[in-house]
């Protein structure tokens, strides 16, 4: 609501429109960072081993699990615009904001927006795209569309892969109003130069190879986070007992804590194997 009022006020001010949009993007960035920060029940972790600063414009690509993903990407840098889908573009709540900030809806194809995006890149902005096109229900990465890689080729922009983990457990696509405890992990992978032929020389080849790389890295993160320290597993276990009466529910809550979330079992039982209960 504040940002919508700000847009109404800024339209009356005798200031360059480009500067107004820059101020709006900065406020969107600060707002998203604040919303993530105040979620104290969520463990947040950001891994940026190469020290990426996002000062040089690039195409940011990320897997899409939850509405939170948008907040996470916009919190990375103020110089960022996004490619959105139909419902976000026409949203009565924030549609006007993202349209004023020069976000893009490419329902008619990326080809029509290349030159507009080129101008935005000249102003120092990066472009964020979810190559899957829509959120996943179960957290698994789906097939990548070629649009982001087509833009990278046409605009000669580097690609920065961003892996998002845990957001689908905090706010799932199927339950958008149910906010749960969990881990919000963001890992920024090394920048891939536009002229790097390691992942192929055409945007079709780069789509397949970079998608495979991101899926491999995401699988690694899933293995690392699948431990008893992840609050998601505790919540899932307790959820199985909430309809069995308050006594049994609270017994399970206390029992699991006393057993240190069954850490010993997690260490002893293999990921794959035949388990016999005798």
What are these regions (language model features)?
Residues 55-57, 79, 124, 272-273:
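A general structural motif
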Residues 46-47, 104-108, 194:
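Short acidic-hydrophobic, aromatic-tinged amphipathic segments that line or gate anion-handling sites
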Residues 4-26, 58-109:
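Catalytic core of membrane glycerolipid acyltransferases/transacylases, capturing the structured
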Residues 276-277:
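Class I SAM-dependent methyltransferase core
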Residues 114-239:
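Non-catalytic C-terminal accessory region of glycerolipid acyltransferases
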């Amino acid at each position: 609501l504040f940002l919508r009022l700000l847009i109404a006020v800024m339209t009356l001010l005798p200031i360059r429109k480009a500067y107004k949009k820059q101020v709006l993007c900065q406020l969107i960035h600060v707002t998203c960072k604040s919303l993530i920060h105040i979620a104290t029940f969520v463990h947040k972790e950001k891994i940026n081993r190469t020290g990426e600063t996002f000062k040089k414009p690039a195409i940011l690509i990320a897997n899409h699990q939850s509405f939170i993903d948008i907040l996470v990407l916009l919190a990375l840098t103020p110089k960022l615009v996004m490619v959105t889908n139909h419902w976000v573009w026409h949203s009565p709540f924030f549609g006007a904001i993202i349209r004023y900030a020069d976000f893009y809806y490419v329902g008619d194809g990326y080809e029509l927006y290349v030159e507009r995006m080129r101008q935005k890149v000249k102003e120092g902005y990066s472009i964020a795209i979810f190559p899957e096109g829509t959120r996943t229900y179960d957290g698994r990465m789906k097939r990548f569309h070629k649009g982001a890689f087509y833009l990278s080729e046409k605009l000669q922009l580097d690609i920065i892969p961003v892996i998002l983990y845990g957001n689908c457990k905090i706010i799932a696509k199927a339950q958008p109003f149910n906010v749960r405890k969990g881990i919000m992990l963001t890992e920024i992978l090394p920048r891939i130069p536009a002229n790097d032929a390691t992942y192929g020389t055409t945007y079709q080849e780069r789509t397949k190879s970079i998608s495979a790389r991101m899926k491999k890295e995401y699988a690694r993160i899933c293995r690392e986070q699948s431990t008893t320290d992840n609050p998601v597993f505790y919540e899932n276990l307790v959820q199985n007992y909430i309809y069995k009466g308050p006594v049994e529910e609270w017994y399970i809550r206390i029992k699991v804590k006393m057993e240190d979330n069954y850490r010993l079992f997690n260490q002893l039982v293999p990921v794959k194997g035949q388990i016999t209960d005798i």
